[in-house]
């Protein structure tokens, strides 16, 4: 269980003293929205006000894009020697690490995730990601193509220009780093639009980047709502790429906006409905642990959460019992500033109501609640839902097909492998999957047959910055993480020279 050196009361005292920055970060400084408007950011932990945030619109996006374009064209970042880029980005990573408690508290207050995870996972992973990509600054080479003896063809990789990065609220720091790390090391300038539910840590990153030596205009952070700020960014004629993580519905809008504007490049990481296929010979203790942590971690607010269990009929009942035991014994729901809590608050009231509505839909469709199923801790003023198991779910049920994005796992059964594979692939999504079995031949058949960007065998949610992350089908295209992510922020130029 994650622990911290502070008690809940210590963190509450720190939270009471915190004065988060809510202004936009444009061209190296904090500025109010040009309209003067703000919106009130409340914490899902208890509903209290934590900041007034700049309610940015098209005019602020215009200012940020102009700053980024100017910085790109004059070469203040693009033309820096690789060793200097590396030094600045490594310094950026170190400043993130040094700001651990501050960033972790912002993240927890903003979105309701537990402080232990913000400290041990979100902030360190953000720093590690920036460091990982910094190391590529002086290790990436152009290529010489094999041509005739009197020709020289150099294949160069060049930055795209201005990148619009739109990130979601579930992992603000981590997903921001997934985007700005490779984009910056490639030599681009970035306009970052955090989700309106989670602007505070991204705004802090802007200042840390400035302290690290990143030139003005290279990283801009513009908070605001999707329709007012995200849409103008995606439609902007001077933005060369949109890198988006969020819902499939909005991802489709990004494609439309790209076509309606300048045919900018688009990379999408969208929704998921990841299946666990549990064969009859699986280690049920290991499977139950992987399933429980894979859906209840971060309150189920994870795009690749293992939200579907497809279990062999002979072991289903025992598996369901074991999942419930893991949830009850190892993943306590509690106040997010309590270091002992492993599940916290859902991000906002509307989202909590949506999750609860899906539990109701599932029971009306014929499923039974095998564990949890209710709102709890309502007296806090926050938005908490129990770890929930819906059993007896059929593949055609809405809860088996639609992304709930909360602490709800649905359980269905199969009797033969072909049926299980069909069920696993019976989804518009293809982000991730897992197969649990002691038979490696069966595991190979499933890893080959499942249409998903990541497939785990006898584990779940193992990850590394060295491995690409992204999905098939309506889970999107393009990959975050790994060296492969850098190339999506670059273009290829071939330079021919003829010799006599």
Features from the language model and the residues they span:
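Rossmann-like NAD(P) dinucleotide-binding subdomain of oxidoreductase/dehydrogenase enzymes
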Residues: 141-286, 414
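Glycine-rich loop-to-alpha-helix module at the N-terminal edge of alpha/beta enzyme cores
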Residues: 48-140
């Amino acid at each position: 269980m994650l622990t911290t050196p502070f008690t809940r009361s210590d963190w509450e005292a720190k939270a009471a003293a915190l004065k988060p920055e809510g202004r936009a970060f444009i061209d190296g400084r904090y500025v109010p929205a040009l309209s003067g408007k703000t919106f009130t950011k409340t914490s899902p932990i208890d509903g209290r006000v934590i900041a007034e945030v700049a309610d940015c619109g098209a005019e602020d996006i215009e200012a940020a894009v102009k700053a980024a374009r100017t910085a790109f064209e004059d070469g203040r970042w693009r033309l820096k020697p690789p060793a200097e880029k590396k030094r600045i980005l490594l310094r950026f990573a170190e400043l993130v690490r040094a700001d651990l408690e501050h960033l972790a508290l912002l993240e927890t207050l903003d979105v309701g995730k537990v402080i232990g995870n913000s400290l041990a996972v979100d902030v360190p992973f953000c720093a590690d990601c920036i460091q990982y990509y910094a190391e590529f600054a002086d290790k990436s080479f152009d290529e010489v193509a094999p041509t005739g003896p009197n020709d020289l063809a150099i294949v160069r990789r060049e930055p795209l220009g201005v990148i619009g990065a739109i990130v979601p609220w579930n992992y603000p720091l981590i997903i921001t780093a997934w985007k700005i790390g490779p984009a910056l090391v490639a030599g681009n300038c970035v306009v970052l639009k955090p989700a309106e539910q989670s602007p505070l840590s991204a705004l802090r990153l802007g200042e840390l980047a400035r302290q690290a030596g990143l030139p003005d205009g290279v990283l801009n952070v513009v908070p605001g709502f999707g329709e007012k700020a995200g849409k103008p960014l995606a439609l902007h004629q001077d933005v060369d790429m949109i890198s988006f993580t969020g819902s499939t519905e909005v991802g489709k809008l990004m494609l439309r906006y790209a076509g309606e504007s300048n045919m900018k490049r688009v990379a999408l990481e969208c929704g998921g409905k990841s299946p666990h296929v549990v064969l009859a010979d699986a280690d049920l203790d290991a499977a139950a642990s992987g399933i429980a942590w894979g859906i209840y971690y971060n309150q189920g607010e994870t795009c690749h959460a293992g939200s579907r269990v497809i279990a062999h009929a002979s072991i289903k009942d025992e598996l369901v019992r074991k999942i419930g035991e893991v949830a009850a014994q190892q993943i306590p729901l509690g106040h997010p500033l309590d270091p002992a809590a492993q599940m916290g608050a859902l991000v906002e009231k509307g989202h909590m109501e949506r999750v609860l509505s899906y539990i109701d839909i599932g029971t009306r469709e014929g499923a039974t609640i095998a564990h949890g199923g209710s709102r709890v801790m309502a007296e806090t003023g926050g938005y908490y839902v129990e770890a929930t198991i819906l059993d007896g779910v059929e593949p055609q049920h809405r809860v088996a097909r639609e992304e709930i994005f909360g602490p709800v796992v649905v359980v269905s059964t199969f009797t033969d492998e072909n049926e299980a594979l069909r069920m696993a692939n019976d989804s518009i999504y293809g982000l991730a999957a897992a197969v649990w079995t002691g038979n490696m031949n069966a595991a190979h058949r499933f890893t080959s047959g499942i249409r998903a960007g990541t497939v785990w065998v006898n584990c779940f949610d193992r990850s590394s910055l060295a491995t690409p992350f992204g999905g098939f089908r309506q889970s999107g295209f393009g990959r975050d993480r790994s060296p492969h992510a850098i190339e999506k922020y670059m273009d290829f130029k071939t330079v021919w020279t003829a010799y006599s």
